[in-house]
């Protein structure tokens, strides 16, 4: 298993270092997904729209939203602004949204997300979290129908942390998850799920890459992180983002500050050493901050 993951990580790193404009991985659906994006949880109104626009202007091509966030229309507005201003084309942007498991009509919710985003297709749609068994299955089946109808390109799940819970979607549905989006950071690395998922050609996507609100300071002021940051002339945030990427994760740090957004993306001109990665890996305590 360890050897397989090392091969998986090397292939990912080859993509990352190759070119700033080509930081993508190939999903088991056949589509390319950027490895670094902007998370928009808690961002609303003009703040959200301006943050997404700033991200696209800084080079990001992965934008993460969700129906539950209530900001899909603002994300869509930013995408239209960016494409109109010639910053990027729609087909260059990878948009992720999520559906809640308690939906009474997930097919309608998918259509509503498309309407709110102002898009003809969604690149990746995730089951946002575990609900009831019947609710989870209903949403997942709706996403599969949407794939067949051309409304969604890839599907996945979020907040599923064990092989057993993830295996349900692999064994019981014709289209497996491409991505598992979970809480993932230096203090909670869940390497066993990452290594197992790699064997299934499923990527782990890290939300809360800096620990999440209320814990960011603890991560950014960690002395091991700061020591490595000084060695590279980089910020603590950049070291942590780089750790996620070199560990084989997709990362979606969130921010509304254009300077921080740009800083988090400026990670393509250096690489952490094997020893530095070991030091950062050793910070794992198995501690999650959320119970979703």
PLM features: residue spans?
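Acidic-and-aromatic substrate-binding clefts and catalytic sites of carbohydrate-active enzymes
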Residues: 41-46, 66-74, 100-106, 131-135, ...
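A structural motif
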Residues: 60, 119-122, 152, 177
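Beta/alpha (TIM)-barrel catalytic core signal, keyed to glycine-rich beta->alpha loops juxtaposed to Asp/Glu
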Residues: 130-292
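Sec-dependent N-terminal signal peptides
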Residues: 4-13
């Amino acid at each position: 298993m360890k050897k397989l993951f090392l091969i998986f990580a090397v292939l990912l790193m080859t993509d990352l270092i190759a070119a700033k404009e080509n930081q993508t991985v190939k999903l088991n659906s056949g589509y390319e997904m950027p490895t670094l994006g902007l998370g928009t949880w808690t961002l609303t109104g003009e703040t959200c729209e301006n943050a997404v626009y700033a991200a696209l202007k800084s080079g990001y091509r992965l934008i993460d939203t969700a129906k539950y966030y209530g900001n899909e229309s603002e994300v869509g507005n930013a995408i239209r602004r960016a494409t109109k201003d010639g910053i990027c084309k729609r087909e260059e942007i990878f948009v992720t949204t999520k559906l809640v498991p308690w939906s009474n009509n997930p097919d309608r919710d998918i259509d509503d997300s498309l309407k709110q985003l102002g898009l003809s297709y969604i690149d990746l749609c995730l089951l946002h979290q575990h609900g009831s068994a019947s609710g989870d299955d209903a949403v997942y089946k709706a996403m599969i129908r949407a794939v067949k109808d051309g409304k969604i390109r890839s599907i996945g799940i979020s907040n599923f942390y064990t092989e057993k819970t993830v295996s349900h979607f692999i064994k019981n549905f014709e289209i497996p998850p491409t991505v598992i989006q979970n809480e993932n950071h230096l203090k909670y690395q869940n390497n066993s799920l990452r290594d197992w998922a790699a064997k299934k050609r499923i990527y782990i996507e890290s939300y809360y890459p800096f620990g999440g609100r209320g814990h960011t300071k603890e991560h950014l002021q960690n002395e091991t992180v700061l020591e490595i940051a000084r060695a590279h002339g980089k910020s603590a945030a950049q070291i942590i983002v780089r750790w996620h990427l070199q560990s084989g994760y997709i990362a979606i740090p969130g921010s509304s500050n254009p300077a921080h957004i740009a800083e988090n993306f400026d990670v393509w001109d250096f690489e952490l050493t094997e020893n530095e990665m070991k030091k950062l890996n050793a910070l794992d305590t198995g501690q999650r901050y959320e119970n979703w």
